[in-house]
Amino acid sequence: MQLSRVRSVLLDVFALAKVKQTLLLLFTMYTAYIVGGGLGKPYERHLVVLTLGFITIAAVTALNMYFDRDIDALMERTRDRPLPAGRLDPLKVFIATVAATIVSVILAWRIINPHFALAIVIGFLFDIVAYTYLLKRRTPLSIIAGAVAGGAPALGGWAAAAGRIDVNALLFSLIVATWVPSHIWFLATYYRDDYRRANVPMLPVVADTPIAVASGIGLGSLVMGYSIVGLWVNNVIGTVSLIVGVIAAIAIFHLAVKYAELGGDPNYSRTAFKKTNMMLGLVFLVMMLEKVVSYIIS
């Protein structure tokens, strides 16, 4: 019985951290770390960067759920999450996640560098303060803060390797940030009734036409493409990464056009949501593999 209880708590903790999403963002961070010059660094440093990255992304995600637990209780998709369902103590979650974030910032500053710590703080402020606490329940423009937060792990990965936040760090961050609208809005379209019930003004809920949503996603895909080209021009990524990245950006643009043509169809949006996740993962996977191959043969 005790083992069953432990297993149940662990599953709830994993659910609180949205492990799949956390791992995707962690992968963008680690790819930026590898491409930014981290490949030749001691393996202990890799382990520290990955550990701190996972803890901070998971902690911020869980803290987001702490603040959203009331609206999660109103939405069919989220009402069985650990906090609205009452399986975990909100105060304990709050204390644990805030403590984990603070400790991670301190360790990032002392063990890696101040710029890595700064990226963690940026992600926290834009996700928890700007997106979740101030904007999400008030305006569809909350997506801007959410996008910056989504790009923070990649920003941190580059900063951890290069020891600075420069234009290439910003370009890496932009790739993820411009993917965020497609990630959130396609999902919000599929669960439109849930968001309406919880009175969360996501653009697919409040927009008079799906063209507004499609335009935002399409514009984001164009900026994503330009960011990838910028990294190639700066000799940060290779030609294979350039080709795959531009194709992915074009594919997301096509998803946006199709979304508009189908009038914001919920079932199509769910499929598009899954495709955009795979595309982001593919782009960063190719970047990492090309860098590793180049390092081995050089």
UniProtKB/Swiss-Prot annotation:
User: Topologically, how does it sit relative to the membrane?
Assistant: Multi-pass membrane protein
**What residue intervals traverse the membrane?**
23-43, 47-67, 93-113, 115-135, 143-163, 169-189, 211-231, 236-256, 278-298
Alphabetical GO biological process terms: heme O biosynthetic process
The EC number(s) attached to this protein equal 2.5.1.141
Which EC class does it fall in? transferase
**Which Pfam families would you find in this protein's record?**
UbiA (PF01040)
Recorded GO molecular functions are: protoheme IX farnesyltransferase activity
Q: InterPro entries attached here? A: Protohaem_IX_farnesylTrfase, UbiA_prenyltransferase, UbiA_prenylTrfase_CS, UbiA_sf
Which pathway does the protein contribute to? Answer: Porphyrin-containing compound metabolism; heme O biosynthesis; heme O from protoheme: step 1/1
Record Gene3D superfamilies = UbiA prenyltransferase
| Record's catalysed reaction(s) | heme b + (2E,6E)-farnesyl diphosphate + H2O = Fe(II)-heme o + diphosphate
Classify the main location.
membrane
Q: Which domain of life is it from?
A: Archaea
State the UniProt keywords alphabetically: Cell membrane, Heme biosynthesis, Membrane, Transferase, Transmembrane, Transmembrane helix
Described purpose of this protein according to its UniProt entry: Converts heme B (protoheme IX) to heme O by substitution of the vinyl group on carbon 2 of heme B porphyrin ring with a hydroxyethyl farnesyl side group.
- Hey, which family's this protein in? Belongs to the UbiA prenyltransferase family. Protoheme IX farnesyltransferase subfamily.
- Write down what this protein is called: Protoheme IX farnesyltransferase
| Gene name tied to this protein | ctaB
